[in-house]
């Protein structure tokens, strides 16, 4: 099977398309290893034409790459919360740059996203390479960020700030009901590649030791660096598409350019580890429990 797999690089810093593979829970271990290697190298990988996948097969395939884990805000409210998280435009549009679930100490290592229902136009997703962003920092900013920590919280989420519908308000109340607060290093060391990556995104509320004005200014500086066009890739979804990204080395955002059409994606996230900074210090839980396997 692996003789048929091809990995086509899509950009100099991020993104690859993998062809010649049929995703599912019965995938050959050698093929899984090739996918994992491509993911670490390219940060986000894409698959076309995976129409055979349903929720069960998506979950089974994701389990070959790691340990599936539900959303911590949902798990905090219900022990039987589903492992698959629906990304449903009815309840909000994640159209600000973020890394998934960084308000938890051991936020997800990776995510597997499948297109379920797509608008007739628009609805693309952008990803940014946070390892490349760190590598391109000037030395003064590297020195600053390597000694900086940030407070991440689910009370400052990434959903649009436009006026909310009743469904969106209800979703936000559920999302924010558990109080998650974690202090992460702004530069974390990737546990598999050893790369240094910038850990920011719109779950950041402030930087430790800085006031609100200083935090806002520095946040904008870092986000501008991370989301430079050269660090990004845009994926235009088609039915049957699947994307997998390394959540430890990327940010992403959906593009809200499909008006009032419906967009539904199903996401499986994989258990992550607690970040450590360049000095070996681990992230600190301020409030809320680390992510756990349901049951």
Swiss-Prot record:
PANTHER family: ALPHA-KETOGLUTARATE-DEPENDENT SULFATE ESTER DIOXYGENASE, ALPHA-KETOGLUTARATE-DEPENDENT SULFONATE DIOXYGENASE. Disruption phenotype: Cells lacking this gene do not replicate in minimal media with 2-ethyl hexyl sulfate as the sole sulfur source, in contrast to wild-type. The keyword Oxidoreductase applies. It comes from Mycobacterium tuberculosis (strain ATCC 25618 / H37Rv). Induction: Repressed by the transcriptional repressor Rv3405c. Gene3D superfamilies: Clavaminate synthase-like. 2-oxoglutarate binds at residues 125, 263, 267. Substrate binds at residues 71, 101. This is Alpha-ketoglutarate-dependent sulfate ester dioxygenase. GO terms for cellular component: cytoplasm; plasma membrane. SUPFAM superfamilies: Clavaminate synthase-like.
